């Protein structure tokens, strides 16, 4: 059994958003083909994403400097527990499906916030001999994205290079 984490990063619903329609159809077809797999849908606009701010950074610094989790304030513990839950969910998933529109040639800000939160040194990457090295091996990812133009499957190399969000997720 695999765990599939669907990260929906679109503020609109399926009745007006092509990527959401395609994402929902993909999940339905996947579930029919793999009924034993667990599918977890995380809607970044419905459920929100904890923002990285001075409070989180202060809490992370305290932990790095030797403060125990129990010594943190109740508010700091609540904040970090939400972040840790999202990180663990991401780390333990076997497959990822990112569903998003292309905004300004990139990904929506909530998806970037989410990735900043879950891609963490020592958990998802380490500093290797030749630079950063990922630690989440043998995982698969799919990016379902709609855009207002054609950026792939074109002879125009310039247009293909403008899809920064897809390249970023790779």
Predicted features along the sequence, with ranges:
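N-terminal beta1-alpha1-beta2 submodule of the flavodoxin-like/Rossmannoid cofactor-binding fold
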Residues: 1-100, 105-109, 113-116, 120
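FMN-binding flavodoxin-like domain, especially the glycine-rich phosphate-binding loop
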Residues: 33, 79-88, 109-170
């Amino acid at each position: 059994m695999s765990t599939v984490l669907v990260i929906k990063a679109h503020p609109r619903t399926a009745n007006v958003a092509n990527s959401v329609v395609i994402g929902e159809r993909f999940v339905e077809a996947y579930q029919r083909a793999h009924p034993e797999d667990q599918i977890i849908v995380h809607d970044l606009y419905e459920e929100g994403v904890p923002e990285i701010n001075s409070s989180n950074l202060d809490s992370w610094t305290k932990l790095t400097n030797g403060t125990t989790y129990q010594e943190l304030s109740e508010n700091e513990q609540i904040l970090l527990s939400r972040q840790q839950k999202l990180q663990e969910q991401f780390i333990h998933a076997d497959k990822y499906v990112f569903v998003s529109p292309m905004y300004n040639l990139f990904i929506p800000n909530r998806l970037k916030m989410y990735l900043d939160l879950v891609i963490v040194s020592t958990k998802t990457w380490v500093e290797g001999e030749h630079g950063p090295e990922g630690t989440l091996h043998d995982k698969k990812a799919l990016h379902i994205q709609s855009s207002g133009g054609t950026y792939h499957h074109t002879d125009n190399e310039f247009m293909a290079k403008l899809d920064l969000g897809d390249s970023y997720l790779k």
